[in-house]
Regions:
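Membrane-embedded helix-loop-helix hairpins and adjacent transmembrane boundary segments
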Residues: 1-483
Length: 483
């Protein structure tokens, strides 16, 4: 066990909890919108890096480099798809979602927005969405907790299960205490750490490999490593990852939290730039790992192994905290999104219609703990699958279920309440069925799921009575809203 690296991790944990305590101290009198959406008062830098950090989980430091390290640059189609999807979501989707959520009775969650968009008192859409949120986010959070366990096991030789418990406790602590503001500010610092680590480590490794440093193996890249055009399935599936952004609640909720259109425009430039650099450097990490390390037993540890071999303990501890940053910044956002879905979309509408703001906050906090416990059970199960697999499954469900209907709700006036319910149900169902029965096709399930959700929403809307004039007026007001 390296006690210097351990000391860095402990200092990092203390800093994260301190942020949670700070915002908890400021939360007296805070309402539902403050805890779950930061009072719609977030600035450009914090929102941009929070959206990016909550998106780019430990997958970007472990999963993506591992895939490219093993299979070559053909796996970068995932990064290309994500980069395109992220840019499109910021440029075209973010301004409208912010306006529409305000016009739709100042909605603070995605299920709430989708219901209020149609001025409906029918809560079936809200409840269906919340159920999908709770299930998928529990699986997603498990991947982040599992990544923390892998890091501690590799670096500190601590039992992975014990490490997962420690990480889960810290994540729950500052999310439970500080809510959305604490999550966004911790994500901001975590995003800076991730950027620094991915800029420093692979460039140092490449320089050392080129210089023939004694630590380097002088390994050559495998034949065909730079073959981008592998199979049509790889390209379609990789680009299909970009569809997930249009339905990823814990990311797009940041669009709704910005305090003005001016801040949103600045945030989009910062966010797209940050993500582009992160994805490029993640791919470069795999190349650097091949050239500097040669063959290693566990490809998911290429970043960890490279950093520990190059840098002294204090520096490696700081750089490896990037993996903690990536995992924790995603997990905290997932826990908060799931808790807000329960508190705002199930607890108040169904269980306690007259619940006060204080009661709503505590309902959300309790759900943070419950989901974290279940996610911890999944993560600690040796049969739960890889980090990449867990992320892939949850990402697919969200993108297929919510992506089509959120896009249509922002750009198509003819969309109906029934069409939205049908789109969510069809997208989720086809995604899951494809995963279970047709995964052998090697087509990522989000692609057919997204297509099914889009088709169902359009067909059912066209076959049903159109939205009333009041719903159409809301659409027009939202388009013209300036704030």
């Amino acid at each position: 066990m390296n006690y210097i690296e351990l000391s860095v991790f402990i200092a990092y944990f203390v800093f994260m909890v301190a942020i949670g305590l700070y915002f908890f101290s400021k939360s007296k009198g805070a309402g539902e919108k403050d805890y779950f959406l930061g009072g719609r008062n977030m600035g450009a830098w914090v929102s941009a890096l929070s959206a990016g950090a909550s998106d780019m989980s430990a997958w970007v430091l472990m999963g993506l480099p591992a895939s490219i390290y093993l299979s070559g640059m053909g796996q970068t189609w995932i990064a290309i798809g994500l980069g395109i999807g992220y840019a499109v979501s910021w440029i075209f989707m973010a301004p409208r979602l912010r306006r529409f959520s305000i016009a739709a009775n100042d909605s603070i969650t995605i299920p709430q927005y989708l219901t209020n968009r149609f001025l409906s008192k029918n809560r079936s859409l809200q409840i269906l969405s919340a159920i999908i949120f709770l299930v998928a986010y529990t699986i997603y959070a498990a991947s982040s907790i599992k990544a923390c366990g892998t890091l501690f096991n590799t670096v500190m030789d601590i039992d992975p299960t014990v490490a997962m418990y420690i990480a889960a406790f810290i994540i729950v602590a500052y999310t439970f205490l500080g809510g959305f503001s604490a999550v966004c500010w911790t994500d901001f610092f975590q995003g800076m750490i991730m950027l620094a680590a991915l800029l420093i480590a692979p460039l140092f490794a490449l320089a050392l490999a080129k210089a023939g440093d004694g630590a380097a193996t002088g390994a050559a890249l495998p034949e065909g490593f730079f073959n981008f055009f592998t199979t049509p399935q790889d390209i379609i599936s990789g680009l299909g990852w970009g569809l997930g952004y249009f339905g990823m609640p814990h990311i797009i909720i940041r669009f709704m939290s910005l305090k003005s259109e001016k801040e949103l425009r600045k945030s989009s430039v910062i966010g797209i730039s940050w993500t582009t650099i992160i994805l490029i450097m993640s791919a470069l990490t795999a190349i650097a790992g091949r050239l500097y390390l040669g063959e290693i037993e566990d490809s998911s540890t290429v970043f960890i192994t490279m950093v520990r071999r190059i840098f002294p303990a204090l520096v490696s501890g700081l750089l490896l905290s990037a993996i903690l940053s990536a995992a924790m910044s995603t997990a905290d956002s997932q826990l908060l999104a799931a808790s807000s879905a329960f508190a705002s979309d199930v607890y108040k509408p169904v269980i306690r219609k007259k619940a006060s703001d204080s009661e709503m906050l505590w309902a959300g906090r309790i759900v943070v703990i419950v989901i974290a416990v279940v996610a911890l059970m999944i993560a600690s199960d040796p049969n739960s699958g890889s980090i990449m697999g867990l992320v892939e499954n949850a990402w697919g469900v969200f993108g297929a279920a919510f992506g089509p209907v959120i896009l249509l709700s922002l750009f198509w006036k003819r969309l109906t309440f029934g069409g939205t319910v049908a789109g969510i149900a069809a997208g989720a169902a086809v995604d899951i069925l494809w995963l279970v029965f047709l995964s052998s096709t090697d087509i990522y399930e989000i692609v057919p799921g997204f297509a099914a959700g889009l088709l169902a929403a359009v067909v059912v809307s066209l076959l049903s009575k159109g939205p009333g004039k009041d719903v159409e007026d809301l659409f027009d007001r939202a388009v013209d809203l300036k704030s």
